[in-house]
């Protein structure tokens, strides 16, 4: 098993969940987050097809996963495109992770997504874009295999940006003849898969894909699994972190707002009297 999935009995009690709760600690993945399930698989697949140069538009978890994967193969190179106004701490984080590797180029541009798209279009580098590339789903099937070890698993709550992990997990569970509820959790700032007039800022700043190109597939996943989408506000995220402190789960209390999103989504479901007939998993995704 690549990452731990401990049972969280005290947190389940604090939330009022009686069927059992597990936390999947993807924040402890060797590549830093759940993106380590998918990005390296994409790189490995495309390198076998002859691609040696890769590019990505990301300033967070996806970029970090790509950096770690590229550093493991001296024959590959990576271009990371970030915006002109990227927070200084994020830029320094990427530079630190790259470790001065000359085959990893971090470039600030006006339009990161379009720059990566054009580089791919010209055949100069393969764009690692999870929002449109179905090879991004493959790596999450292994994650589904680990979660499948939880007996009578009833539901999974997923902080969701592009929707790739939700779809990939659903596909993986089918291979294990399982169909737990898939619940996605988004923010007021970004919820393309959830039809709602709600808008506003959010501390969960890794949820950024406002276009929702996977909408059809994600909505099918929710319908077929019996899950749904939830929009979580900052106040709910902070409430979860306070609960973690109150029950002396100090390590978990320091998880990012992005990671706390899944637990806050579960808390909202419980308040809305959502029914579970077995244990629930909340994905702790990373930064």
Regions found by a protein language model. Give the residues of each.
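A glycine-rich, Thr/Ser-enriched phosphate-binding loop motif common to dinucleotide/cofactor-binding enzymes
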Residues: 27-41, 128-147, 254-261
């Amino acid at each position: 098993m690549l990452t731990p999935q401990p049972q969280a009995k005290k947190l389940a009690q604090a939330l009022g969940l009686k069927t059992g709760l597990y936390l999947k600690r993807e924040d402890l993945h060797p590549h830093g987050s759940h993106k380590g399930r998918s990005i390296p698989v994409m790189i490995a697949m495309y390198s076998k097809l002859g691609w040696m140069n890769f590019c990505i538009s990301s300033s967070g978890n996806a970029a970090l996963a790509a950096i770690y994967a590229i550093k493991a193969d001296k024959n590959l190179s990576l271009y990371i495109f970030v915006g002109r106004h990227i927070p200084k701490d994020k830029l320094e984080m990427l530079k630190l992770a790259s470790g001065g590797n000359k085959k990893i180029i971090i470039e600030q541009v006006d339009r990161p997504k379009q720059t990566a798209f054009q580089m791919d279009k010209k055949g100069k580098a393969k764009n690692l874009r999870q929002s449109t590339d179905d090879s991004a789903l493959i790596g999450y099937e292994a994650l589904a295999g680990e979660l499948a070890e939880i007996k009578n698993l009833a539901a999974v709550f997923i902080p969701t940006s592009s929707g790739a992990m939700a779809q990939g997990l659903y596909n993986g569970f089918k291979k294990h003849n399982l169909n737990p509820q898939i619940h996605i959790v988004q923010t007021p700032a970004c919820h393309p898969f959830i039809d709602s007039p709600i808008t506003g800022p959010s501390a969960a700043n890794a949820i950024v894909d406002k276009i929702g190109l996977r909408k059809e597939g994600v909505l099918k996943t929710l319908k077929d699994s019996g899950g749904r989408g939830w929009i979580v506000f900052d106040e709910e995220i902070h409430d979860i972190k306070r609960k973690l402190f109150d029950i002396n789960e100090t390590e978990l209390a320091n998880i990012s707002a992005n990671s706390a999103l899944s637990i806050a989504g579960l808390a909202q479901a419980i308040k809305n009297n959502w029914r579970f007939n077995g244990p629930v998993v909340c994905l702790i995704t990373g930064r």
